[in-house]
């Protein structure tokens, strides 16, 4: 039976490259001269530290543009609340979303079931497997899910006949 997997993965090396490019641009930009803006990549999060809200927003814009250039979807970045830090600075955590959560998996399965296509979808850890008797039905599911905005970046992998 033909099947494929729906996953949401982020290439961490590309995230590291985007963060490094952001650091380089911050160090070279005129409006950041003399500021103490920092951006650090941790295991599954990016920590932003800036002088004020304006500079933090500028750092976020730079980070987003670098992520887009590196092929990283903005949907995979989950922004936390802006918190005050010591010395009048502000900080923000940006979580990098890896995998499909149970709630998003249920949403994907609901969309597939609403389509009335003859396929089955099931959640497996952080991915969703879709199986069906007909390869064309699976391709229709891919087309359907690409047209929907589910709040996560989806990749379709492991297509088997």
From Swiss-Prot:
InterPro entries: DUF520, UPF0234-like_C, UPF0234_N, YajQ-like_sf
Keywords: Nucleotide-binding
GO molecular function: nucleotide binding
This protein's record includes keyword Nucleotide-binding: yes
GO CC list: cytosol
Bilayer-spanning residue ranges: none
Family designation: Belongs to the YajQ family.
Function field: Nucleotide-binding protein.
Family annotation (PANTHER family): UPF0234 PROTEIN YAJQ (PTHR30476:SF0)
NCBIfam families linked to this entry: PRK05412.1
Name under which the protein is recorded: Nucleotide-binding protein GSU3204
Phylogenetic classification of the source organism: Bacteria, Pseudomonadati, Thermodesulfobacteriota, Desulfuromonadia, Geobacterales
